[in-house]
Amino acid sequence: MKFGIERLLADPTLRAPLIGKRVALLAHPASVTADLTHSLDALMALGDLNITAAFGPQHGLRGDKQDNMIESPDFTDPEHGIAVFSLYGEVRRPTGQMMISFDVILIDLQDLGCRIYTFITTLLYILEAAAEHGKEVWVLDRPNPAGRPIEGLTLLNGWESFVGAGPIPMRHGLTLGELGNWFIAHYNIDVDYRVIEMEGYAPNSAPGYGWPEDRIWINPSPNAANINMARAYAGTVMVEGATISEGRGTTRALELFGAPDIDASAVLAKMRDFAPHWLSGCILRLCWFEPTFHKHVGTLCHGIQIHAEGPGYEHVGFKPWRLQALAFKAIRLLYPDYDLWRDFPYEYELGKLAIDVINGGPALRLWVDNPAATPAELDAMTSPDETAWEQERRAFLLY
């Protein structure tokens, strides 16, 4: 299997339209070839491209910044001497001054397949700026490590944000290249756009469901440590909007959740009693952890770890969004007065609860907080969105 970057590097005919043009690269630490050469270094080494600038998304080109409004500065690359512009610093949309530094921008970002992962919003902002300034956008495509499954509520009109680029469900099942085509169609963006497709991508095939077994995983963001996290993320990311810990400050962030003042054994038992069919496709294991930073720092937490890997993993049956919704529901049923929802500025959104920003509306939170609400009622809200998206996205599937 070859990723888009590898096809571009190997085939001079693919690169031919870039010759004589000023080329920029939007990348992060996971922008590497199969032998772990960073894409910027590999493109520079070709000798036939004029690389004039680089861009970094949230967490930075170097991937050194943590979550939620921890910004990266612009800098000059010390090896190649080109400007590196931050798209998560003073601005999140590229400025006109940034746009005049190139003719074509190559986007080589490893996504996680989740609406809230901000790289897809950065893609949208680049497409819109490129349309305004007459620039070309090429996506060097990479696998969606969460695969093709769809899950979650569609973002409501008026709830767009940096973690909500458009009316898509939480788990969208598209690659970045495919999403670019959807953005262009949905928002009617007049831009010169091209996808350098992968070769041999098989998102519905076991065991990796699009992620090759022999491919080394590199964190695209500091807490995206492995495929298990990528699969669980569409659910565990919701814990960012709660007072319980998502495991930041541990080595398994966004693969587990817990708090010092809950009985995780009781929570798991309640989950199994309330909606056991939402727990399929993975193994849930009770655990203890003590965050070294972030929520509940230095405090022993009782929690649950999600194992969406190994013999217990079932790709189609795994429902991370419903699983995490169920965990919230179990906590609310066991502890009716628990201060569950975290009220703080979240990804530059003020005046809205983070859990609502994450879900693109209040429906999930209202379901959790309603003691009479049933699993069937959440399914009744969510399933039509999932079915509609499955039909809508068909026209944009490249693989």
PLM features: what roles do these ranges have?
Residues 111-123:
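Glycine/threonine-rich flexible loop motifs
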Residues 201-297:
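Glycine-rich, aromatic-lined ligand/substrate-binding cores of catalytic
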Residues 1-49:
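N-terminal phosphate-binding or glycine-rich loops at protein starts, especially the Walker A/P-loop
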Residues 67-102, 114:
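Glycine-rich oxoanion-binding loops at beta->alpha junctions
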Residues 258-379:
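Conserved functional hotspot residues or short segments at active or partner-binding sites
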Residues 159-234:
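Conserved anion/nucleotide-ligand pocket segment
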Residues 63-67, 138-160:
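Glycine-rich, charge-decorated loop segments at or immediately adjacent to ligand/cofactor-binding or catalytic sites
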Residues 50-59, 140:
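Short internal beta-strands
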